[in-house]
Amino acid sequence: MTEHDLFDLAPYIDHTQLDPLATRADIERCCGEAEQWKFAAVCVMPVWVKTAVQLLHRTPVKVCTVIGFPSGAHTSSTKLYEAQEAVDSGATELDVVINLGWLKEGNSEAVYRDIAQICAETGVTVKAILETTVLTEEEKQLAVDICLDAGVAFLKTSTGWRGGATVADVRLLKRLSRDRVGIKASGGIRTREQALELINAGATRLGTSRSLDLMQV
């Protein structure tokens, strides 16, 4: 076996089930797979956080959920309530979509307040979703600067609704953030080869619903 085959992807993976049609059986399957493969976390819709916590409470697998998903265009008070409710339900990681409209119009202060309040009030790991596929280079730089100032723990490339992670964007986020935070690549990660390329580019976490495919060597 090669070094490529032996590399353990499991600690990098947020095993994702964000299908709005998902049932309890789907969540049970997702959590069971995460426990079996020892993935870093599961990422589920807010309505399923309590269920995931109950299923995984005896395991080291973290429970993550999404906030302001997928548009980021919720009011700041709605996002904060959603985040606090998720944490009260047991989530220890939050993937929060930043307000892209405010970013594009240059309203940096509003974008900052929107994400900073969640970091400050919840005290858990916050991953800011930047939706890099719809941003210019200048907007990516601005988004990174704002999110670093706000206190996020990770920068996340994408929701997966407007395209996915690219090696180029992962490299860029790593460079712009100067290694101060983790980088989560998400969206369209379907093969082991893709996963390894993204990790080599600087990704420290991978969000994918195709986790089991990535584990095949």
Curated annotation (Swiss-Prot):
Location in or out of the cell: Cytoplasm
CDD domains: DeoC
Pathway(s) where this gene product acts: Carbohydrate degradation; 2-deoxy-D-ribose 1-phosphate degradation; D-glyceraldehyde 3-phosphate and acetaldehyde from 2-deoxy-alpha-D-ribose 1-phosphate: step 2/2
Catalysis: reaction(s): 2-deoxy-D-ribose 5-phosphate = D-glyceraldehyde 3-phosphate + acetaldehyde
Coarse class of the protein's main subcellular location: cytoplasm
SMART domains: DeoC (SM01133)
Gene Ontology MF terms in the entry: deoxyribose-phosphate aldolase activity
Record SUPFAM superfamilies: Aldolase (SSF51569)
Biological process, per Gene Ontology: 2-deoxyribose 1-phosphate catabolic process; carbohydrate catabolic process; deoxyribonucleotide catabolic process
Alphabetical UniProt keywords: Cytoplasm, Lyase, Schiff base
EC number of this enzyme: 4.1.2.4
Active site: D95 (proton donor/acceptor), K156 (schiff-base intermediate with acetaldehyde), K184 (proton donor/acceptor)
Domain of life: Bacteria
GO CC annotations, alphabetized: cytoplasm
Family, per entry: Belongs to the DeoC/FbaB aldolase family. DeoC type 1 subfamily.
Physiological role: Catalyzes a reversible aldol reaction between acetaldehyde and D-glyceraldehyde 3-phosphate to generate 2-deoxy-D-ribose 5-phosphate.
Stated name of the protein: Deoxyribose-phosphate aldolase
Organism: Thermosynechococcus vestitus (strain NIES-2133 / IAM M-273 / BP-1)
